[in-house]
A protein has these predicted regions:
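Bacterial N-terminal signal peptides
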Residues: 11-21
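Immediate post-signal-peptide N-terminus of mature secreted/exported proteins
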Residues: 26-67, 141-144, 148-158
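Non-transmembrane, amphipathic alpha-helical segments
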Residues: 28-35, 54-61, 83, 87-90, ...
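Amphipathic, well-ordered alpha-helical segments in soluble domains
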Residues: 39-46, 68, 72-75, 97, ...
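Short, solvent-exposed, charged loop/turn and helix-capping segments
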Residues: 72-94
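Surface-exposed, polar helix/loop patches in the mature regions of secreted/periplasmic/lumenal proteins
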Residues: 86-145
Length: 158
């Protein structure tokens, strides 16, 4: 009886470890890893552009940034199109939430005269975006504090 309990406990432990490790293992073997990294980087860059436009009180430009954000979201969808359905569904759910949050910032910008409410809403959008990024391995997630190439960022070698 005791040995049966020990075996069941060991199997349960192994099952738990495999269950927890499976998403991480699946996520680390993307079929298009460079495309995934590029799409995630684009999302961060456009988010930073949102912030810059709001801080500069260039509210009329914010809807254009939203359009670019949706293009970056589509790039991510394309980058993961050959991944397992379960992973794609998780990404799509969080991606839709992030896009909706950035759309709210864009919609608010039409009547904005003060950057503070937009910045508060932008912070919520960033939280939604970070929730999306949590689905990806840490080495795929871009550093939001690095400027993009061409704006003081790293230059690519030809």
């Amino acid at each position: 009886m005791k040995s049966t309990k020990k075996i069941l406990a060991a199997l349960a432990s192994i099952g738990l470890v495999l269950t927890l490790a499976a998403p991480m293992l699946a996520a680390q073997s993307f079929k298009s890893p460079d495309d995934v990294k590029t799409a995630l980087k684009l999302l961060v860059q456009v988010s930073n552009d949102f912030k810059r436009q709001i801080n500069n009180k260039n509210f009329a430009r914010v809807p254009h940034e939203f359009m670019e954000y949706t293009e970056a979201a589509d790039a991510l969808r394309g980058a993961i199109k050959n991944e397992p359905a379960d992973f794609k569904n998780k990404v799509e759910t969080r991606l839709k939430a992030a896009v909706a949050a950035y759309q709210k910032v864009s919609d608010m910008s039409a009547k904005a005269t003060d950057p503070q409410p937009l910045m508060a809403e932008h912070a919520k959008a960033v939280t939604a975006m970070n929730s999306l990024f949590d689905l990806f391995p840490a080495d795929y997630r871009p550093d939001p504090n690095l400027p993009p190439p061409g704006r003081g960022g790293a230059k690519k070698n030809p």
